[in-house]
């Protein structure tokens, strides 16, 4: 059986995946310092502030985290609530309309999936 989080590490590196999981666990926008404290709690080898800041900035540049200016620093929050959401965002970002068209074509081949997709669209 696959270890929980393996899907995320397929999309990102191990440290990036750990940062994203910590941001999900926070449940609200966080500063670099707040996430650093969360990551370092119970950890024998402490991460440096600059390491976490660099990783969070790279994740924001990749579109995985959203960055909001607050005072002299930033607040960060995940753009998706799970690894599937991140994967879909990446596919849509990389392939655009073609990815959406293929998704709809796949949904058309299974009436249950098509109904679910329609229901989800109506909820938005």
Where on the chain are the PLM-derived regions?
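Short, hydrophobic-biased segments on the C-terminal half of alpha helices
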Residues: 53-57
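Short helix-coil junctions and helix-kink-helix linkers
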Residues: 37-47
């Amino acid at each position: 059986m696959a270890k929980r989080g393996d899907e995320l590490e397929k999309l990102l590196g191990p440290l990036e995946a750990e940062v994203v999981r910590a941001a999900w666990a926070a449940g609200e926008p966080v500063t670099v310092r707040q996430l650093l404290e969360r990551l370092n709690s119970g950890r024998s080898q402490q991460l440096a502030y600059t390491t976490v800041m660099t990783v969070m900035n790279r994740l924001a540049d990749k579109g995985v985290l959203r960055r909001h200016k607050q005072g002299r620093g930033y607040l960060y929050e995940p753009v998706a609530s799970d690894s599937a959401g991140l994967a879909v965002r990446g596919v849509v970002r990389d392939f655009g309309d073609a990815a959406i068209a293929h998704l709809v074509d796949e949904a058309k081949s299974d009436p249950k999936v098509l109904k679910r997709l329609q229901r989800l669209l109506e909820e938005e």
